[in-house]
Each structure stands twice: as C-alpha cells, then as structure tokens.
Amino acid sequence: MIEIDGSFGEGGGQILRTSLTLSVITGKPFRIFNIRANRPNPGLQRQHLWAVKAMKMISNAETKGDEVGSKELIFVPHEIKGNTNIDIDVGTAGSVTLIIQTVLPAIINKNVRIRIKGGTDVPKSPTIDYIRLVYLEILRKIGIEAKLNLIKRGHYPEGGGEVIIENVNGNPSAFSLLELGKLTIIKGISHVSSLPAHIAERQMNSAREILSKLGVPIEIQTDVRQGEVSKGSGIALAAIGEKSIIGADSLGERGKRAEIVGEEAARILIDNLNTKASVDIHMSDMLMIFASLYGGEYIGAELTSHAYTNMEIIKKFLDIKIDVSGKRPFRFKAKIF
C-alpha cells in the first residue's frame, strides 16, 4: 500500500485529490496520514469527503477514515464502474470544479455521467467558465473530449450551483505544448447571478479596454441569470493561440467594483501571456496529471507549490521520470516520460 504524508509540500487538499485520481486509474491502494495537518481546520472537510465519495462510487472502493475531521484515510479501489450515473452534492459552496478535476481523468471512455451540486464560482478554485473555456479546450488538444452542461451557478457562501459532466471520451497520447503560438483571439464570459445585468456589462467593458492593446479580436459574452440561489459575479478569459490557450478569471465580491473585477482578470491574463509559457498558472498544475499518464511536455507560467507537490505524489503511483527545468516560483518546462 502506498503511504502518503498529507502534510508534505503545500499540505492541502490537492494531495488527496491527486492521490484519489491516480489510485482509481492505477488500481493501487493508498494510506494518507497527517491530512491537512498544518491548516487552520485540519483533517478532511466536507468538500474533501465528496471527492473521496465520488471516487469511491466510481471505483466501488473500500475506505476507512472517510469522515469529517479525519486526519487519516485508507482507500482501496476496485474496477471502475462504467455505464453509470453518479450524483454528488458538495454542499453550500464547496467547489464543483475541484471535483471535476478529480474525477475526469478517471472516467475517460467509461460512459459515466456525473451531476455535481455546489459552488461553480468560488474563491481558491478555477471558475466553471475557466473550466469550459480553457481546461476542456486544452484537453481537446491532447485528444480528450467532454461535455459540460452548466445548469445553475453557485457562489459563496450559499452555493446552489449544478453541472453535469458526461461523454468524456478520447484517445489521448503523448503531447507537446511548448508554445502558445500566434495569438488569434480572446474569448470570455462575464456573468452575474441574481444581480443587475449592468454588472456583467461593466466587467466585460473593463476587461475589453485593457485587452484591446493586444491587437486581436475580443469576443466576451455576458451570462445573466436571475432567480439563482446565490448572488455573485465574475469573468473568465481565454487567450487563444495557434497552438495553446492561456486563461484567467476573477470573481466579484461585496465592495469590489465591477470594473475592478474585469481589470483584475485582464491583468492576470496579460501577466501570464508575458511569461511566454504555453499554459497559465492553473493549467501548469492541472495538466501535469495528463502528461504523467500519457507522456507530455509543456511550459508552465509558474512552478507553484501545488505543481511541485503534484510531482512528488504522481511519482508514488506511476513509474515515470519528471524532468523539470526552472525554479519556483518562475516559468518552467515540464517533460514527463
């Protein structure tokens, strides 16, 4: 059984999520201890438990220690169950997108349909529009297709969002994403839920003003939804090059003007573009598991503590070599074979 110290590296939930994904894919059981030991609320929290429960349902796994506050978990997966529907409710504003990242690599070509309820646009995780505009589009470039249906948005703290992920199929193989290529267009989605529509317009216009100096077409849509459980706003942007995509997002909050939200996302996007990387900070982390499974190389905008921790966890499950050139927290090249 693979032993994992949950306090290693950044010491957060990413260690657990990566372990769950690779355990289900490889069939290797693991024991993780010191879960989130150095965090303000140590041990498993509700949203971490739903990642465990989701992967448990997918693989008919045996578990021990899967309860709120537990600092140790044993996870023994069995064969992945295909042709099935799974419902996951992470509660209030638990992150839907972190669940998507955990389950998606394990359900490729398995005909699994997953309905996830919780927070679609919440702090400390990619927004659902980032997932749609950037994450899924980059996966398409490496041979993985997925259908994501956004039914309801959920913001912190009430949540109430709902998405369905299905038709995750493909024939992924070794890939090389070493440059963005010529920038062709910037796409985006500016949204509001149960708030005045002009907020989405102001976010969009603010971002557009800053991005106009890049000299490429800008297509930002607005998504205005009234009657949602939670109130909130945000914007996600995708700079689409001939070979890859760079993304960024920003969320509104009480007291934060809509213009600041749009400006923030635009400046983050430009900062990532200026690194000359092939993928942004979010994808620098998220692409690593796919490069590890299929072989791949890419240039990430920043070698974060998440990415570094991911490398070490991945090597516990897979017999691979990870060659990284670059120093934290700067641009880096990852080659995995």
From Swiss-Prot:
Q: Name one GO biological process term.
A: RNA processing
Matching entries from InterPro entries are given as:
RNA3'-term_phos_cycl_insert (IPR013791), RNA3'_phos_cyclase_dom (IPR023797), RNA3'_phos_cyclase_dom_sf (IPR037136), RNA3'_term_phos_cyc (IPR000228), RNA3'_term_phos_cyc_type_1 (IPR017770), RNA3'_term_phos_cycl-like_CS (IPR020719), RNA3'P_cycl/enolpyr_Trfase_a/b (IPR013792), RPTC_insert (IPR036553)
Write down the top EC class of this protein. Answer: ligase
Q: What is its EC number?
A: 6.5.1.4
Predominant place of localization: cytoplasm
Q: Name one GO molecular function term.
A: ATP binding
**Cellular localisation:** Cytoplasm
Q: What's its catalytic activity?
A: a 3'-end 3'-phospho-ribonucleotide-RNA + ATP = a 3'-end 2',3'-cyclophospho-ribonucleotide-RNA + AMP + diphosphate
* Stored SUPFAM superfamilies: EPT/RTPC-like
Q: Which HAMAP family match?
A: RTC
The entry's function note states: Catalyzes the conversion of 3'-phosphate to a 2',3'-cyclic phosphodiester at the end of RNA. The mechanism of action of the enzyme occurs in 3 steps: (A) adenylation of the enzyme by ATP; (B) transfer of adenylate to an RNA-N3'P to produce RNA-N3'PP5'A; (C) and attack of the adjacent 2'-hydroxyl on the 3'-phosphorus in the diester linkage to produce the cyclic end product. The biological role of this enzyme is unknown but it is likely to function in some aspects of cellular RNA processing.
Q: Which family does it belong to?
A: Belongs to the RNA 3'-terminal cyclase family. Type 1 subfamily.
Q: What is this protein called?
A: RNA 3'-terminal phosphate cyclase
